[in-house]
Amino acid sequence: MHASVGPGWLRAIGCLLAAVAAYPLYPTDRLRAQQPQQSGGIETIQVRPNVWMLAGAGGNIVVHVGWMGAVLVDTGAAEMSDQVLSAIQRITDTRIRFIINTGADPEHVGGNAVLARAGRTLLRYAPNAGNFAGSDFQTNFGAAGIMAQENVLTRMSASDTYPATGWPTEAFTGARVRSLYLNGDGVQMFHQPAAHSDADTIVFFRRADVIVAGDILDLRHFPIIDLENGGTIDGEIAALNRLIDLTVPPAPLVWHEDRTLVIPGHGRIADQADVVEYRDMVTVIRDRIADMIKRGMSLEQIKRADPAKGYRRQYGPETGPWTNDMFVTAVYRSLTAKS
């Protein structure tokens, strides 16, 4: 005897087929399909209706446009500031209103001063208007405001490289999550202590569903662990886990383009699957080195044992600013510093 299919099941199957038919088998998202534009060495990629990524200025820059104006995440290297400003002006004729820095590295904060001066503050007056000097500082003397984790301000103000007009005008401390509402979008900033460095911030545009990861994520090579500035391998893995927790995959319609997009500090745009693969790679290598340390192996012995085996071709160049050897050394020193 064969079971019959009732009308309820037929309706359910019909709804499922209709839903599948509504989505093509190939990506049609006009933004992802749009060809990047390049001018003055800056590549402009539209990733959402109101979100763009600028590449080629040192680190990736994100431009979020809305009724308030343009909100930037990072500003690139100082020497590329004029080209970056021109690229932003091709995207929008609104003023730069706010800048958020993901870290303190020169390729992310170098353009702060020029781009802030090209903008205009969101605040006509500061909350503590009774204190004239404090009021001017919070409104950045009419220029766009700059927000970052306090260690970014500490680094920039301790260096002769950066003019005071490029320092963060608001540095958040204490709580690891800071929230703002900009351009009709909820913006969350998560401080990730001791990851790439001790000054890393993840920026999440909730409505746009875009995350800016800064130097926590760089799919071109193994993560850079900046030991001198508070970076650790365990903090890096914790930060990658945070990224995974914040992202949403395209399930159940896995062939469609709808998903959380993650913009790294350098290189191509990623999604949750990319971050998971990257996190797993970093974790495997960390665990291999930790096991070798427990067995009493020296750094040179660990290098000869090749703990990055299976990943070097994709992530571990032998030459350049960040190599396989440098990564293994950083992981070893990070792990042995705890003991």
Tell me what each language-model feature is.
Residues 1-16, 25-29:
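Bacterial N-terminal signal peptides that target proteins for export
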Residues 34, 124, 131, 251-259, ...:
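Accessory terminal helices/loops
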Residues 42-90, 201-214:
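Conserved beta-strand hairpin/beta-sheet module of binuclear metal-dependent hydrolase folds
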Residues 44, 67-71, 78-131, 142-144:
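Active-site metal-binding motif and surrounding structural segment of the metallo-beta-lactamase
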Residues 46, 69-70, 75-79, 131-193, 197-198, 206-207, ...:
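Metallo-beta-lactamase
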Residues 50, 64, 74, 88, ...:
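Divalent metal-coordination and catalytic microenvironments
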Residues 58-61, 70, 77-80, 103-109, ...:
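Solvent-exposed loop/turn segments at secondary-structure junctions
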